[in-house]
Regions:
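Long, amphipathic alpha-helical stalk/connector segments used for oligomerization, subunit docking
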Residues: 1-39
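Short glycine/threonine-rich loop-to-helix capping motif typified by GTGT followed
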Residues: 10-25, 46-59, 141-147, 175-179
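Flexible loop/turn segments at secondary-structure boundaries
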Residues: 11-12, 36-37, 46-47, 138-143, ...
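Intrinsic disorder at enzyme termini
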Residues: 24-129
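Short, glycine-/Ser/Thr-/acidic-enriched flexible segments
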Residues: 43-44, 71-89, 136-139, 167, ...
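Generic long, charged, amphipathic alpha-helical segments
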Residues: 121-186, 193-204, 211
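Peripheral docking tails and interdomain loops at the edges
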Residues: 198-250
Length: 250
């Protein structure tokens, strides 16, 4: 060991930061008149809710991941029994004459799970919407974006279908029609979208929702030709998927 003090710097820095944050919170509680008064005034509850909201946003944007929920979902997972809605939206148990508001229980994955359940309920009556990959062009990019898109849409419980790619637009269009795609995801490199995406859109726009995987520089030109849907790493995944549910009548 060359520098013991230097090696402990990271732990000491974290410890100091935690202590400073804890002391700041302690003083804020004291300003409310103590912990009990802080509870009665809703100060503690507001702080907890603010933390929950920040975490909800991080989960929706996949900055915080739950494997199997908002990242790497099981494409074939099915719910085999009825579920109580209280799992996704806990009841408010605060009594009418209570002095202190009761906090609801919190689970980070709940919003994604509720969204997926909504698709499952719809699928039981109408069939599960198919999201079909339309890979074309650069092999590495189309495979990477198809994988990203499959993972993206499976989070909402859609049936995702991938394939090895197409040599022509007509070949891809035919496959989409044969698979009765509700959503078609164009998967390619940024540079190649301008060359085939408008043609694919024109031939499929009356049959399915057309989505571009990525956020290419040519997006303004593509939007001018009608391509308005894009999925990429900066999306709020939860809100995007809810939007596609609405478009499909779910």
């Amino acid at each position: 060991i060359v520098d013991v003090a230097g090696g402990s710097y990271y732990i000491e820095e974290l410890t100091e930061n935690i202590a400073e944050a804890a002391w700041k919170l302690f003083l804020e509680v004291q300003e409310q008149g103590g912990y009990v008064e802080a509870l009665k005034k809703g100060f503690v509850q507001a702080a907890v809710k603010a933390t929950a909201q920040a975490r909800d946003l991080a989960i929706a944007q996949r900055k915080e991941n739950f494997v199997g929920v908002n990242q790497f979902p099981n494409f074939n997972e099915k719910i085999d029994r009825p579920l109580c809605s209280c799992i996704f939206e806990p009841e408010d148990e605060t009594a009418e004459d209570a002095e202190i508001e009761t906090l609801k229980s919190y689970r980070g994955p709940a919003a994604f799970e509720a969204m997926r359940l909504k698709t499952d309920v719809y699928a039981a009556q109408n069939g599960r919407p198919v999201v079909y990959m339309f890979p074309m062009g650069n092999l590495a990019m189309r495979k990477a974006r198809a994988q990203f898109a499959c993972n993206f849409f499976a989070c909402a419980g859609f049936e995702v279908k991938d394939n090895n790619g197409f040599k022509t637009v007509d070949e891809g269009v035919q496959a989409c029609l044969e698979n009765k795609a509700a959503i078609v995801v164009l998967c390619s490199s940024d540079d190649e979208y301008a060359g085939f995406a408008p043609e694919a859109f024109e031939k499929l726009k009356d049959k399915a929702i057309i989505v571009v995987a990525g956020n290419p520089e040519s997006r303004p030109e593509l939007e001018a030709k009608g391509l308005m849907n894009y999925i990429h790493v900066k999306n709020n995944v939860l809100e995007e998927l809810k939007g596609y549910q609405q478009k499909l009548g779910i």
